[in-house]
A protein has these predicted regions:
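N-terminal, positively charged nucleic-acid-binding surface of large information/translation enzymes
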Residues: 1-181
Length: 181
C-alpha cells in the first residue's frame, strides 16, 4: 500500500442550500479520492459544513430560526448532496459537533504550548455575503454606501481582535517540502 492520502472539500457554509459550485468542488475532490484509491493509496476523504459566522447568523435571523436549528436543516441538504452525487467521502463533519470541538481544542492547546499562535488585531472592509476582505482600491462608494467593485456586495469596516498562526515562520520549510515532494 502506498502512502496515506487526505483530501477534503471546503467545509461549506450552510447559509443556503447547496448550489452548482458546491457540487463542482465535491465532484473534483471525489475524482481525486477515487484516483488515489485506484493508485493504491489509503485515502481519507472528508466533507462537511462550517457552522459559524455572521453570514450564518444573518441567514438564520432572516429565516426566524435559531442558528443551530437553521444549520441542522441546511447541513442535512449538504449531507444529502453526497448521496445524490454518489460521492465516496469517508466522513461528513459539522463544526458544531463535539468531536470537531474536541479536535480543535486539542490542536489549539498544542499550538499555544508551542507558541505558534499570537493575539493581534485586524481591520478592513469586509463583505459578509462574499465572506471576503477588500482593499481600498477594490471598493467604491455607491449612493453613500461602500460596495465591492467586483461583486457589488455591501462592505462594512470591521476591527477585531483575533488569534493568528505564525505562518511566515513556516514559509521556508513549507516551500522546501513542496519542492521536494
Amino acid at each position: 500500500m502506498k502512502d496515506n492520502f487526505y483530501i477534503t472539500t471546503p467545509i461549506y457554509y450552510p447559509s443556503a442550500k447547496p448550489h452548482m459550485g458546491h457540487a463542482y468542488s465535491s465532484i473534483v475532490a471525489d475524482f481525486f479520492a477515487r484516483l488515489k484509491r485506484i493508485q493504491g493509496h489509503k485515502v481519507f476523504f472528508l466533507t462537511g459544513t462550517d457552522e459559524h459566522g455572521q453570514k450564518i447568523q444573518r441567514a438564520a435571523e432572516k429565516s426566524n430560526k435559531d442558528p443551530l436549528k437553521f444549520c441542522d436543516e441546511i447541513s442535512k441538504t449538504f449531507r444529502n448532496l453526497s448521496s445524490l452525487l454518489n460521492l465516496s467521502n469517508d466522513d461528513f463533519i459539522r463544526t458544531t459537533e463535539k468531536r470537531h470541538a474536541s479536535a480543535v481544542t486539542n490542536l489549539w492547546n498544542i499550538l499555544e504550548k508551542k507558541k505558534e499562535i499570537y493575539l493581534s488585531k485586524y481591520s478592513g472592509w469586509y463583505s459578509v455575503s462574499d465572506e471576503a476582505f477588500y482593499n481600498e482600491d477594490e471598493i467604491e462608494d455607491l449612493e453613500g454606501k461602500k460596495i465591492s467593485k467586483s461583486s457589488g456586495s455591501p462592505v462594512e469596516w470591521v476591527e477585531e481582535e483575533s488569534y493568528f498562526f505564525k505562518l511566515s515562520k513556516w514559509q521556508e520549510p513549507l516551500l522546501k517540502f513542496y519542492s521536494e515532494n
